[in-house]
């Protein structure tokens, strides 16, 4: 959501993306691919909205895409997104087996299983837990330390990809779109983002759980403020 990303809140936007509105009997959604044909809707004449691309353009500081048929990856990406210190957008391609599971569709289960191109293998290591790294038989690994001390370990597969490079993320998504590939994984992350709580020195404790005594200024503080005003 472009408007939401203007303010650096700690928020996760998770999309269960299947390309249709199932509750209204299979209408095209904004992410339905152009040329898709559905029984009750005909042929879609519009270009799809790429959620990951929109999130990048709107300055989200965590952008990822996964496929519901890869639950291990979904689980790890959710952990990282929830630990992220800024705006996180996770696009989960989730096939609708009732209204939109055509074999050649980007949002179908068979397409996802056969055309998925993972950028890397992902492991999430929460902060304050013992960190162990096993020997890797192939490839190299890259550690990305999040704001709270948590670490994301990326094991590179075939692609030489840096998820902290925003320009490279745009290029990768554009190439995947041209090649009709479903690229999944951590697309972009800014581990050094400062959220609105840090900017304004706000407490972690929710206001509705903060005791009145803690919120009410002391008489000395009130007198000091009054002296500045009058």
PLM regions and their residue ranges:
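Short, small-residue-biased leader/transition segments that mark boundaries at the very start
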Residues: 1-12
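A glycine-rich helix N-cap at a beta->alpha junction
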Residues: 10-20
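Short gly/pro/ser/thr-enriched loop/turn and capping motifs at secondary-structure boundaries
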Residues: 18-23, 97-98
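Active-site-proximal loop->helix
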Residues: 23-35, 54
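Short, surface-exposed, charged loop/turn segments at secondary-structure junctions
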Residues: 27-32, 71, 79-83, 101-115
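Flexible, low-complexity linker and terminal segments
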Residues: 98-230
């Amino acid at each position: 959501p472009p408007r939401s990303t203007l303010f650096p809140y700690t928020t996760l936007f998770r999309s269960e993306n299947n390309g249709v509105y199932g509750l209204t009997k299979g209408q095209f959604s904004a992410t339905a691919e152009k040329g898709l044909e559905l029984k009750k809707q005909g042929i879609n004449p519009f270009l799809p909205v790429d959620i990951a691309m929109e999130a990048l353009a709107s300055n989200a500081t965590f952008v990822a895409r996964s496929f519901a048929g890869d639950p291990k990856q979904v689980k790890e990406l959710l952990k990282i997104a929830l630990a992220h210190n800024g705006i996180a957008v996770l696009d989960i391609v989730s096939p609708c087996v009732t209204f939109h599971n055509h074999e050649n569709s980007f949002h179908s289960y068979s397409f996802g299983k056969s055309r998925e191109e993972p950028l890397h293998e992902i492991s999430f290591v929460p902060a304050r837990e013992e960190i162990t790294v096993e020997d890797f038989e192939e490839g190299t690994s890259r550690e990305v330390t999040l704001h709270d001390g948590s670490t994301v370990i990326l094991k590179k597969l075939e692609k030489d990809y840096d998820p902290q490079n925003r320009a490279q993320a745009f290029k990768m998504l554009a190439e995947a779109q041209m090649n009709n590939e479903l690229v999944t994984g951590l697309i972009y992350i800014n581990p050094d983002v400062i959220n609105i709580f840090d900017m304004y020195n706000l407490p972690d404790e929710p206001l509705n759980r903060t005791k009145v005594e803690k919120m009410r200024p002391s008489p000395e503080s009130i007198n000091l403020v009054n002296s500045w005003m009058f």
